[in-house]
Amino acid sequence: MPRKTLLPLVPACDAAPRRKRLAAALLAVPGLVPAVSQAQLSGAAAEPQTFGSPWDLRLAPQLDEHPQKQGGKPATFVLADHTGGTADQDLAAKGSAEIRRGNAVVKADAIHYDQDTDMADAYGKVTVANGGTTFSGPEAHLKVEANQGFMTTPKYHFTATGGSGSAERVQLLDSERSVFTNGTYTGCQCSTNPAWYIRGSEFDFDTGADEGVARNGVLFFQGVPLFGSPWLTFPLSGERRSGFLPPTFSPFSSTNGIEVSLPYYFNIAPNRDLTITPHIISKRGIFTQATFRYLSTNYSGALTGEYLPDDRIAHRNRYAIFWQHQQNFGNGFGGYIYYNKVSDNLYPEELGSTNQFVNGIQTVYQQEAGLTYNDGPWSVLGRYQHWQTLPPAVAPYGREPQLNVKYAKYNVGGFDFGAEADYSRFRITTADQPEGDRVMFNPYVSYGLYGPGYFFVPKAQLHIASYDLTTTTGGVPDQAKRFTYSIPTLSLDTGLVFDRSVRLFGQDYIQTLEPRLFYVYTPYRNQSNAPLFDTAVSDFGLAEIFTPNTFVGNDRIADANRLTAALTTRFINPATGDERARFVIAQQYYFTDQRVTLLPTEAPATARHSDLILGASVKLGAGFASETAFQYNVDNNQLVKSSVGFGYSPGERRVINVGYRYTRQNPTLSNEPINQILMSAQWPLTRRLYAVGRLNYDLASSRVVDGLVGFQYDADCWAFGVGVQRYANGLNTSGQQNSSTRVLAQLVLKGLTSIDNGLVTAFRAGVQGYTPLPPAPAPLSRFSNYD
């Protein structure tokens, strides 16, 4: 017998098949079918596309949701195998019965519907769906439009957030709020036997507020209770919200003992938040950390404060302040503040953040505020800069204050010209060091000739520096306090580019041959009176040999009469333009001695040529890449410096890095010799298990500089990681590096929370190319399982 359908106030009619009647009913009520996508088109793209005559079916680019007009009542649709009842009063539907009203759908084996009260009583395999939330159970009693009522022994699923669970009873308050009695909640897609779930005597869910509250809630993982609370709140999705974050636990250490922390997060506004984290340190006391972050269209920043009152070991109050602020005033004006301060010299070693395990202990803290202006060729910086320096670091000079102005114009009739002017007052916290003012002016002009296979760029520049010292180095009699240097520099940078087509290893390439010459001439000027405010010897490498000055900074300008010659060849994929390989060889030739030295006690450089520099970069298929650089002394037949690195990454979360660093000790330079091998990797052992490791081993001393080994397991709705790290932890009394070991762990309950005491941070810093485990899949749209 055909199924019957009945609309309120309309007699039943069973002449048409059920699907056709349902389709006709849906099409007859505009706005009944929600949009399949939240994205909205506009313009011509949003207009329906027609085919043939005006009476043909049309393709619409989107489904539009039309809200119910105020005062209007949506139509009610009833479908079933058998229907009966009294017109305009009640209705009985049996056999695959359905009631649809607005966005609400009730399905059951049998439904009794009272039209006056809008009350539906459903029995047998009941399903209630409204606004992307689905409830199923043996029976339900509710008002259809208001979505108010109750169900017994329901199972539920939030389509928009991915959460699900079961309970003894659910009280439906409206389309967004519901109360469950003696129930469970999980974010796992597998709801029959989830890896984690929360069990509570009562759950209050509000999908509109994206919040769930469990009373007498206990968090279970793999059937084991992890955490319990009489009042447990949690988000239903990944949106930020105020509340407690997962606690962290650090194992016992000789410095601090056991440490436990419990952060609380305040979601003040979409662009502001505050995290307060009390730490219980068994050997020292209660250590509190607070971080305030803010973001606006014109400014952003973060302020962190740390405080430990009456340290039980140090017997004093200890604190730290870290503030970063960026400001855009408009019209090219900006500003910034970097203020960092710790209470004592041992603070970073004993109470520093987890970043110290990766980057080493911080011993220099910047305290700086500045104003900037940028407009076309103009760039202006005014700042006040100070440093807090902890031993054994050497204190740098502060600029108290500095005003720097730069001007640059390009391609004005083929000329590039500009200038830099700078005034700085240098101060230092170290005793018996020179201090004073320096005014510097550096104008320049160049003219470039460029062609398809060549370039020719002569350049002239002038360095003027004037000093007014308030204090000089102790022990130097009659040292001048006011003096000025004026030093010109001429340079010529030129090169050619040849190319040809070649075929190597069955592949076509474009090979280039690029000879380059760089000549620089700077006359000698005695600069021994000038202090070293911001100057040091420049590194010697491919990035530095084409610069006119062998010093960085403005207190030394090297006299020069030298020529740099380099030859580069590259292999380029003609189809994509991707550079597959590059090889470089370069050397400098000196026509006169370099008399200007960093310190007056140093001897002038008398060599006639520099060390030979060789470099290579290779990228092959299947994710293989290599970077190699050598500095070789031809006269002594010695390798001065080398850096060799190989990387292999055939796919995501598959990377192997191998590197070697070598630096020969130079008696004339206070450099530390380096002879180290570095290996790091991330690699899958199974489909879900990954190994991560890093080893930095010093071959000269036969010791581990730093190391890391760990594993990560990725399941459908949870992930776990563990690692052991050996790291540098300051210097001992003899100046040797101390090392310590710590255990790292991470537990991620996807869809709920993550507990991590620095594991992912250590993996990111230790393994180049490391990729974190994937997050939980995004929840489905509320229209994904649309009925």
UniProtKB/Swiss-Prot annotation:
One of its GO terms (cellular component) is transporter complex. It is found in: Cell outer membrane. Residues 1-39 form the signal peptide. InterPro entries: LipoPS_assembly_LptD (IPR020889), LptD (IPR050218), LptD_C (IPR007543). It comes from the Bacteria. Keywords: Cell outer membrane, Membrane, Signal. GO terms for biological process: Gram-negative-bacterium-type cell outer membrane assembly; lipopolysaccharide transport. Its main location: membrane. Belongs to the LptD family. PANTHER family: LPS-ASSEMBLY PROTEIN, LPS-ASSEMBLY PROTEIN LPTD. Together with LptE, is involved in the assembly of lipopolysaccharide (LPS) at the surface of the outer membrane. Component of the lipopolysaccharide transport and assembly complex. Interacts with LptE and LptA. This is LPS-assembly protein LptD. It comes from Burkholderia thailandensis (strain ATCC 700388 / DSM 13276 / CCUG 48851 / CIP 106301 / E264). The lineage of its organism: Bacteria, Pseudomonadati, Pseudomonadota, Betaproteobacteria, Burkholderiales.
